[in-house]
Each structure stands twice: as structure tokens, then as C-alpha cells.
From Swiss-Prot:
One of its GO terms (biological process) is mycothiol biosynthetic process. 1D-myo-inositol 3-phosphate binds at H20, D31, A32, G33, G34, M35, N36, K89, Y122, T146, R166. Catalyzes the transfer of a N-acetyl-glucosamine moiety to 1D-myo-inositol 3-phosphate to produce 1D-myo-inositol 2-acetamido-2-deoxy-glucopyranoside 3-phosphate in the mycothiol biosynthesis pathway. Its EC number is 2.4.1.250. InterPro entries: Glyco_trans_1, Glyco_trans_4-like_N, Glycosyltransferase_grp1, Mycothiol_biosynthesis_MshA. This is D-inositol 3-phosphate glycosyltransferase. UDP-N-acetyl-alpha-D-glucosamine binds at Q26, P27, G34, R240, K245, M306, E328, E336. Mg(2+) binds at Y315, R316, A318, T342. It catalyses: 1D-myo-inositol 3-phosphate + UDP-N-acetyl-alpha-D-glucosamine = 1D-myo-inositol 2-acetamido-2-deoxy-alpha-D-glucopyranoside 3-phosphate + UDP + H(+). PANTHER family: SULFOQUINOVOSYL TRANSFERASE SQD2 (PTHR45947:SF3). CDD domains: GT4_sucrose_synthase. Keywords: Glycosyltransferase, Magnesium, Metal-binding, Transferase. Gene3D superfamilies: Glycogen Phosphorylase B.
Length: 424
């Protein structure tokens, strides 16, 4: 076993573990979402601070090289573990041993003490992190991103509960990790009350937003770029197409708005931007059928996920961005939209209550009632004065969530974990 790191040795390298989703994947497709953005942006900012980062992820194609330089100082290591394609997230636990063995081999060829800290993301990665922690004798810092007990307590009608294996796996990681990073105060509270985490091990580190990419701009130009008329009322959803994210609620709320104000039809655009979760169909047929059944298929667009500059255009083009999720550990979409100067209507759940300031940068809706969301969307989208006031406040609010601060706070947590282990 490697000797524990000396307390006065500077941090040099981090082993970042993101087993089930690659930082190279396009967010909004498959299982790629906010966690992908988090891992990429945090790693980039850590590299800016002089910390080298290796990101270990499961290879999903034989064509992928063993390693890819994301940016100078950040290397993605594609680990072969199980079939390259066709595995759902629920089938990945069977590949944990194979993946962990490959991660341990990667360190074994290095000089002793090559990595100073392990940072795992999501419970599957946490299980691998536990094995690496014991072998390498370096601290394990873990970020949950989502928690099964929280998700199971607020399932959408057509969603399925998380399996017992995940519940047990999360409990094991929470108990053994040296440091637990929570996105918000609420998540920190849930770690303590639902999982029995030691409060002293839990630290709140807010995610960030890329304030260079997601910034205010000319709405008319943005609308030309995405192909909507300048006087349109644009309601946008951004994210994976899955019950948890509830894009159907936006479609239903838009239909309700048109029932009440049919004169809006000529100007209304409902943009659902994202792809099906997991190995779903390329086109979200069920949601397209819902739009047809509700009579709003003529105003509804399904837009494939896209790189960030194009996404920023959609945020700027939108009158309001809707985030109706049943559960969110934070809600990066809400923050990105606000950084672009667009108010947000969101469900009053989880981290969205931190990401959105109710009544100031947008509206938080208790529950998931169609009428309530229709009311909130109409209150902002059809009132230019409200949109302008909230949009300005949204930009100011988002300025406090840069990734640079996230990286600095995370690095401090790494140092605390390292010093604590060295002192034991």
C-alpha cells in the first residue's frame, strides 16, 4: 500500500472518476447532462490552478483512443469495461470490478503516490473510488450529483424507482468517503438526514456557469440564429428527455396557455432542446404525440442537443426557460439561462431553489400542476416589463456562480481531506 501523502506536500494530481458518462459526450444526449458539464468545467479550472487531472471514464466505442487531452493539464482516459455499446446505466454495476481493475493498473505503472486525491462523481464512480482509496492511501472526495432516496421520494407518474443496489452503494460511499461535496445547503442536509453522513465531512460547493459562453446578447440576433420570428413568445426546455426532467409538463402548460389566450398561437414557439435519456429513440416520439394530441404540434419544435454556443443562442432567444424537474441537485440549465439574461420558471425542488431567486430572477412553482406552470410561464412570457426586470436580475445573480470559484472551493476541500488523512 502506498504511504499516505505528507501533510505539507502540495497537491499536484487528481484522479477524477466519471464511470457512467464521458466528459467527451454531448450534454443532453443519452446519460450525458449536467454532471458532464460539471466534470469538464471543474477539471479545466483545476488545470488553470496548476492541478493536473486524469478523468477515468468507461469507453463506449472501440474507436476511442485510450487517452484524449481535453485541454492542457486534463486527460480523459477511456477504460474498456464491458461491451462498448448498448449497456444501460442499470447494467453498469456488473462492470465495476473490470473498470476498477483498469483504474488501479493505470496507477500501478506510475511512481508511488502519483495521485494526491481521488474525486468520484455519482455512486458508481464512488464504488471504484473506495477501492482506489484503500489501494493508493489517498483521500476520496465524492460528489453525489443525484441521490436515490431523494429521487424515489418525488417520482414522476411514469418514472421507476431507483434499485436497492444503488441505495446500498450510495450508503457505502457516504460512510467511507473522506469528504462529501454537496451542491447546495439542501443537499448537504439530505446527506446528513437521509444517509447519516457525518456533518463535519460535508462541504457545500456550488456548481458554476461559464460566464464567457453564457452571457447576455442581442435577442433579435439570437432569434434570427435559431430561426424564430422577432416578436415570438419562446418557451424553452433544455435537457434530457426523461420523466425526471418533465418536458411533457412544458408542452401541457403551453397548451393550457393557448386555451386561455388563443391569440398567442401565431407567436408561440415551444422549443424542447435535448435527446432521450439512456439508449432511447433519437426522436422523442411520445412527446411529439403528446403535442399532437393537445393540438400544439404546430408550435412545438424538437431540437437536437448542440454545442454550447448554439445553446446560448437558444437561451437568449427564449422569453422564458422552463425547468419543471421532479428532482434536481442543482439545475445548471437554470443558471445558464439566467447568465444569458433569460428568466426561469422552475419547479420548487432541490437545488433549483438555490439556482433561481423566486420572484426576482424567475418564478418557483410548488408542485407540478399544469395550471400553475401555465400561470407562471404566462406571467413572464407575455409581460415585456417583467421579462426585462427579471432578466437583468438574472444576469446579476448568475455572476456569483463562476466555475473559477467552484474550482477554488473544491481545491480547498481536497487540501482539507489530504491534511486530515495525513494527521490520522
Amino acid at each position: 500500500m502506498t504511504e499516505p501523502p505528507a501533510v505539507d506536500r502540495p497537491l499536484r494530481r487528481v484522479a477524477m472518476i466519471s464511470l457512467h458518462t464521458s466528459p467527451l459526450d454531448q450534454p443532453g444526449t443519452g446519460d450525458a447532462g449536467g454532471m458532464n458539464v460539471y466534470v469538464v468545467e471543474l477539471s479545466r479550472r483545476l488545470a488553470d490552478l496548476g492541478i493536473a487531472v486524469d478523468i477515468f471514464t468507461r469507453a463506449t466505442s472501440s474507436a476511442l483512443p485510450a487517452k484524449v487531452e481535453l485541454v492542457p493539464g486534463v486527460t480523459v482516459r477511456n477504460v474498456a469495461a464491458g461491451p462498448y455499446e448498448g449497456l444501460s446505466k442499470n447494467e453498469l454495476p456488473a462492470q465495476l470490478c473490470t473498470f476498477a481493475r483498469a483504474v488501479l493498473r493505470a496507477e500501478a505503472i506510475r511512481e508511488p503516490g502519483y495521485y494526491d486525491v481521488i474525486h468520484s462523481h455519482y455512486w458508481l464512480s464512488g464504488q471504484v473510488g473506495l477501492l482506489a482509496r484503500d489501494r493508493w492511501a489517498v483521500p476520496l472526495v465524492h460528489t453525489m450529483h443525484t441521490m436515490a432516496k431523494v429521487k424515489n421520494a418525488s417520482l414522476a407518474d411514469d418514472d421507476v424507482p431507483e434499485p436497492p443496489a444503488r441505495l446500498l452503494g450510495e450508503e457505502q460511499v457516504v460512510e467511507a468517503a473522506d469528504r462529501l461535496l454537496a451542491n447546495t445547503d439542501e443537499e448537504a442536509h439530505e446527506l446528513v438526514t437521509l444517509y447519516g453522513a457525518q456533518p463535519a465531512k460535508v462541504e457545500v460547493v456550488n456548481p458554476g456557469v461559464d460566464l464567457e459562453v453564457f452571457a447576455p446578447g442581442d435577442q433579435a440576433a439570437a432569434r434570427r440564429a435559431v430561426g424564430v420570428r422577432e416578436d415570438a413568445i419562446v418557451l424553452a426546455f433544455v435537457g434530457r428527455i426523461q420523466p425526471l426532467k418533465a418536458p411533457d409538463l412544458l408542452i401541457r402548460a403551453a397548451a393550457r396557455m393557448l386555451e386561455r389566450q388563443p391569440e398567442l398561437r401565431d407567436r408561440l414557439v415551444v422549443a424542447v432542446i435535448g435527446g432521450p435519456s439512456g439508449n432511447g429513440m433519437e426522436h422523442p416520439e411520445a412527446h411529439a404525440e403528446l403535442a399532437r394530441r393537445l393540438g400544439v404540434d404546430d408550435v412545438t419544435r424538437f431540437v437536437k442537443p448542440m454545442p454550447r454556443p448554439g445553446l446560448a443562442d437558444w437561451y437568449r432567444a427564449a422569453s422564458v426557460v422552463c425547468v419543471p424537474s421532479y428532482s434536481e441537485s442543482f439545475g445548471l440549465v437554470a443558471l445558464e439561462a439566467q447568465a444569458c439574461g433569460t428568466p426561469v420558471v422552475a419547479a420548487a425542488v432541490g437545488g433549483l431553489t438555490t439556482a433561481v431567486t423566486d420572484g426576482v430572477t424567475g418564478l418557483l412553482v410548488p408542485g407540478h400542476g399544469v395550471d400553475d406552470f401555465a400561470d407562471a410561464l404566462a406571467a413572464i412570457a407575455t409581460d415585456p416589463g417583467t421579462r426585462e426586470t427579471m432578466g437583468k436580475a438574472a444576469v446579476e445573480h448568475a455572476q456569483g456562480f463562476g466555475w473559477e470559484l467552484t474550482a477554488q472551493t473544491t481545491l480547498a476541500a481536497y487540501r482539507t481531506a489530504t491534511e486530515t488523512m495525513a494527521a490520522e
